[in-house]
Amino acid sequence: MASYAVLGATGNCGSALIQLLLQRPDASIHAFCRNKPKLIGLLPEIEKSERVTIYQGSIKDTDLLTACLRGRRAVFMVLSSNINEPGFRVGRDANKAVIEVLRTLHREDSGSTGPPPKIILLSSATLDDTLSRKTPYLLRQILHMSASHIYNDLAETEKLLRAEQEWLTTVFVKPGALSVDEQRGHALSFVESDNPVSYLDLAAAMIEAADDTTDKYDMKNIGVVNTNGAARFPTGTPLCIATGLLRHFVPSLHPYLP
C-alpha cells in the first residue's frame, strides 16, 4: 500500500491532497494537524476511514511526529499561510522538526526499510526566476513584497532541506497563484508555472511528483501548468496583496489588519 503523510492537513492544499488520495484504494494517509474537528468538518468521510489516521498536536511533539512519519513513502509539507505575518517561520520550524525525526528514524532503521520518505515541499514560483519568467517584473516585485515574510521563511526552509540532500530527497513544487476551484488537469514543468492553478490540480501535481520513480524531479524546482483551462481568479487576492504590502512596509500594523 502506498503510504503518505500530509503535514498541514487542514489547509486548502492539505485537504485537497487528502481528498485526491482517498480516491486511490491503495493509499494509506497520515494526516497531521492542530485541529482534528476542523479537519473532519472539511472532510467528513475521513472520520470512519480505515485508511486515514489523524495526528492532532504540535509539530514540536517529537513522539507524535515520529508516529506520523514512520513508515511513510512520501511526506507532503504544506504548512504555510496567506497572511504576511512579520517573523513568520512555520516552514523552518516544521521542517527542522521533520528533519530531526527522519534522521533519527533513518539511524534506527540503518537502511533496513529502504530510504527515508521523499519530502514534497509546497513553495512558490515567485522565488524562481525561470518558473516566474512570464510574470512582469514590477508585478513580481509587488507579489514578493506582499508576502515577503512568508517567502523569507520558504527560502530559509529550502536551504535547510538542500543542506540534507546527501541522505534526504526533496521535490520543490512551486506553483503560481492558487485558487479554490475544480480540478481541470495539470502538468509538471521545469520551465513555467501558470496563474492561477486550482488547489486540486496542485495536489494532483504534488502526488505525481511523489509517485515518480525516475528521480527526475528530485531536488528540482517544479512548476505546475494547466492543461484544460485556467482556474478561476481568486477574488480575495487584491485584499491579500494590499494587507501584505502594509505588513511588509509597516510590520507594526499586523495586529490590526484582517
Curated annotation (Swiss-Prot):
- Extract the InterPro entries matched here: NAD(P)-bd_dom (IPR016040), NAD(P)-bd_dom_sf (IPR036291)
Its domain of life reads: Eukaryota
Per UniProt, the keywords (alphabetical) are: Monooxygenase, Oxidoreductase
Any idea which GO molecular function terms this record carries? monooxygenase activity
Enzyme Commission designation: 1.1.1.-
| Xref: Pfam families | NAD_binding_10
Induction of synthesis: Expression correlates with the formation of the sclerotia and thus the pigment production.
Q: What class of enzyme is it?
A: oxidoreductase
Cite the Gene3D superfamilies for this sequence: NAD(P)-binding Rossmann-like Domain
Which family is this protein grouped under? Belongs to the avfA family.
Q: What does this protein do?
A: Oxidoreductase; part of the ergochrome gene cluster responsible for the typical purple-black color of the ergot sclerotia. The ergochrome gene cluster produces several ergot pigments including the yellow ergochrome secalonic acid and its derivatives, as well as the red anthraquinones endocrocin and clavorubin. The pathway begins with the synthesis of atrochrysone thioester by the polyketide synthase (PKS) CPUR_05437. The atrochrysone carboxyl ACP thioesterase CPUR_05436 then breaks the thioester bond and releases the atrochrysone carboxylic acid from CPUR_05437.
Name under which the protein is recorded = Oxidoreductase CPUR_05430
- Organism, per UniProt? Claviceps purpurea (strain 20.1)
